Design a protein with these regions (language model features):
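N-terminal lobe/hinge region of extracytoplasmic solute-binding protein
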Residues: 42-92, 122, 193
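A structural "hinge/loop" feature
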Residues: 43-61, 84-86, 110, 163-172, ...
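Gly/Pro-rich hinge or "lid" segments in bacterial periplasmic/extracellular proteins
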Residues: 76-77, 169-223, 230, 238, ...
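Aromatic- and charge-enriched surface segment that lines or borders ligand/interaction sites
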Residues: 86-130, 153, 293-295
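Surface-exposed binding/hinge segments that line
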Residues: 134-179, 202-204
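Ligand-site clamp/hinge motif
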Residues: 186, 216-264, 406-408, 413-414
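Detector for C-terminal structural segments
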Residues: 204, 208, 306-337, 388-397, ...
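Append "and occasionally in soluble cytosolic enzymes with long acidic Gly/Pro-rich linkers
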Residues: 212-213, 295-398, 486, 536-537
C-alpha cells in the first residue's frame, strides 16, 4: 500500500526561516481560546490524489481546498469574491488584470509570493495541465510581471471580463520552488505543503488522509488561523457506510451530499445539522465522439429524447432536484429567459428519429442496427457511489430500450472514472455531475472548447469555438446574453451532451462535539475553506 508522509516542520527549519518568513498565528485571541481538537470527516469514495492541478476529482478537491485554497471563493448568495487576494482590478477592456495577494505563508513559514502565482499560470499553460489553458491561456507572459512581492499584473492577448473570477476560483497556487524542476506534472506526487489553514501530514490511499493545522495561516479569526488542530478524512465504500459512520460517532461530518433515504435516517436526531443548498452544477450524459455511432446527431437527438427528467427527479431523486430542460442551468434566470430547450422526452419520437435515419432492428432482438450492421449498444460509465445512481440508471436504460437502444451499465470507482473518462477519453456514454458551472456567460469555453480538459467527449466545433470566444471578450452584458442564446440554439441542434437535472444538495454534520458549521454554495459544502476555519470544539 502506498503511504505518503508529507512535510513536517522541524525545529531547525523554523529557526532558519524566522527572520525572513512568517510567524505562527497568535492563539491568544478570543477565537484562539477555541483552538484544538480533531474532526473526523467521512468520504463516500477514495480521493484520487493530492495533485489537484492535474485531475478533476471532487473528493480530492474537497480535501485540498483546505491545503491550497482557491484565491477566489463563493459567498452565501452564490457570488464570487476575493478571498485570499486583497484586490483584483482590470483596465477598461479587460486586457490587463492586477491581482494583489493577501499575506500568505506555506506551512514552513515561507511567504507565498507574486512570483509563485505568475509561475503557476505559466507552468500550467506550458505543460497543458488541467484547466490552465482555459483560464490562463490568454495570458501574454512576456508582457506580464510582478511589480512587488504580492502583486501580479497579467497582460492578456484579448479581453476576458471574468478572467480572475475563473482563474482565481479554480486554480490554486503552485509553489515555484517545488514545481519548477518537475518535468512531468501529471505523474508527480505532490508534497502536501499548504498555504491554507492546513497541510497534508499523511495520505494513505483508499483509507484516510490526515491534515495538520498550518501555524502560519492568519487569514481567519482575527489572525488566529483555523480553530481545529487536525482534520482526518476517512474513506468509506459508499454513502450507506459513510452515513452509518456518522450515526455511530466515527465521523463528525459527511463531505458528500446525501440521498433522500439517508436524510430520512438522520433527521429525527436533533444533534445533526442538516442543511440543503441548490447546486451550481448539474447532472449530464456525455457522448464520446470516439464512438462512430455517437458522431451521428440523429443518434444523439434520439438519446436525448429518451431522457425522462420528470421521472429522474421525482422517482430516482425523490423530488430532491430540479429538471433541466435548457442547456443552461435554471439557477441562472437571465440566461434561460429565452427558454431554448433540449429535446422533450418522447421515446416514440426517438424511435422515429432513428428509423428515419436508417437504424432498424433486423434480427428482432430489440436493438437497432446501423446500415452496416453495428448495433446501437452503448456502455454507460459512471461513479458507482453517486447518490441515487441505481435508480437513475434503471430509468435511463428502460427508456433507451423503448427507442431500440441498449444501455450497458458500468459503475466504477472515482479513479477508474478519471482514468477512462475525464483523462483517458475511452468510453461510450458517461453519466456524471458537475459540482459547479459558474460565470456561464464566459466560461463555457472550459467545457466545450476545442482541446479543453473538460471536453472529454472530444466534440470539437469551430462554430461553437467562435461563439464561446466572442462571449469571453464581450464587455457588454446584454450582448453576451445574445451570444449565449446563439450558443444555446447551436447546442440543441448538435447536442454534444445532454443535461438532465440540478440536484438540491443536502449535507449533514454532527453538532455533539463541534459547532460553527456553515453551508455555502459550491463543491465543498461544510468543508469550504472560508467557512470551515470557524468550526470549533464546544
Amino acid at each position: 500500500m502506498k503511504k505518503f508522509l508529507a512535510l513536517v516542520l522541524s525545529l531547525c527549519l523554523v529557526l532558519s526561516l524566522a527572520a525572513c518568513g512568517g510567524k505562527p498565528a497568535d492563539d491568544d485571541t478570543a477565537e484562539g481560546s477555541k483552538t484544538g481538537g480533531t474532526i473526523q470527516v467521512g468520504l463516500n469514495s477514495a480521493p484520487v490524489s493530492m495533485n489537484i492541478w492535474c485531475q478533476n476529482d471532487l473528493n480530492s478537491a474537497t480535501i485540498m481546498n483546505l491545503v491550497c485554497p482557491n484565491l477566489v471563493t463563493i459567498d452565501d448568495d452564490g457570488n464570487k469574491y476575493d478571498y485570499l487576494t486583497e484586490s483584483s482590478e482590470s483596465n477598461e477592456d479587460c486586457t490587463v488584470w492586477t491581482i494583489k495577494l493577501k499575506e500568505l505563508y506555506w506551512n514552513d513559514g515561507t511567504p507565498v509570493t507574486s512570483a509563485d502565482l505568475l509561475f503557476t499560470a505559466k507552468y500550467g499553460v506550458e505543460h497543458h495541465i488541467g484547466f490552465f489553458d482555459s483560464y490562463y491561456g490568454l495570458v501574454d507572459f512576456e508582457k506580464s510581471s510582478c511589480p512587488d512581492e504580492r502583486t501580479v499584473e497579467f497582460a492578456l492577448t484579448s479581453g476576458n471580463v471574468n478572467f480572475w473570477k475563473g482563474a482565481g476560483n479554480w486554480i490554486p497556487v503552485m509553489r515555484e520552488s517545488e514545481w519548477s524542476s518537475v518535468e512531468e506534472p501529471t505523474t508527480y506526487s505532490y508534497s502536501g505543503a499548504g498555504y491554507g489553514p492546513y497541510y497534508v501530514s499523511e495520505w494513505v490511499d483508499g483509507e484516510y488522509v490526515t491534515l495538520k493545522r498550518n501555524p502560519y495561516f492568519t487569514q481567519a479569526n482575527d489572525g488566529a488561523g483555523a480553530c481545529i488542530d487536525e482534520v482526518v478524512f476517512r474513506v468509506y465504500t459508499d454513502e450507506n457506510a459513510m452515513v452509518l459512520a456518522l450515526q455511530n460517532g466515527e465521523v463528525d461530518v459527511c463531505a458528500n451530499f446525501l440521498s433522500a433515504s439517508s436524510i430520512s435516517q438522520l433527521q429525527s436526531n436533533s444533534n445533526y445539522q442538516i442543511e440543503s443548498v441548490g447546486s451550481l452544477g448539474y447532472t449530464l450524459l456525455t457522448f464520446s465522439q470516439s464512438n462512430e455511432l455517437l458522431q451521428d446527431v440523429n443518434v444523439r437527438k434520439a438519446l436525448a429524447a429518451s431522457c425522462d427528467r420528470e421521472a429522474l427527479v421525482n422517482v430516482a431523486m425523490s423530488g430532491a432536484a430540479t429538471p433541466m430542460y435548457t442547456p443552461i442551468s435554471p439557477v441562472y434566470s437571465d440566461f434561460t429567459a429565452s427558454n431554448i430547450r433540449q429535446p422533450e422526452f418522447d421515446t416514440a419520437a426517438a424511435a422515429s428519429i432513428l428509423e428515419n435515419a436508417g437504424y432498424v432492428d433486423t434480427n428482432g432482438d430489440g436493438i437497432r442496427e446501423s446500415a452496416d450492421g453495428k448495433p446501437l449498444s452503448f456502455t454507460i460509465t459512471y461513479k458507482g457511489t453517486m447518490a441515487n445512481v441505481d435508480g437513475i440508471m434503471s430509468i435511463l436504460s428502460s427508456d433507451f430500450a423503448k427507442a431500440g437502444v441498449e444501455l450497458k451499465l458500468q459503475p466504477v470507482d472515482a479513479a477508474t472514472f478519471s482514468a477512462n473518462v475525464t483523462q483517458g477519453h475511452k468510453y461510450d456514454i458517461s453519466y456524471s455531475s458537475w459540482g459547479t458551472i459558474d460565470d456561464v456567460d464566459t466560461t463555457l469555453l472550459t467545457i466545450f472548447g476545442i482541446g479543453q480538459t473538460l471536453n472529454f467527449m472530444e466534440f470539437n466545433s469551430q462554430e461553437q469555438e467562435d461563439l464561446l470566444n466572442a462571449m469571453q471578450s464581450e464587455t457588454d452584458y446584454n450582448k453576451r446574453v445574445e451570444l449565449l442564446n446563439q450558443w444555446q440554439s447551436w447546442f440543441v441542434e448538435n447536442l454534444p451532451c445532454c443535461h438532465l437535472f440540478v440536484p438540491n444538495n443536502t449535507y449533514a454534520a454532527d453538532t455533539t462535539n463541534f459547532t460553527g458549521w456553515h453551508l455555502s454554495p459550491g463543491n465543498s459544502a461544510f468543508l469550504a475553506c472560508a467557512n470551515f476555519v470557524n468550526v470549533h470544539a464546544k
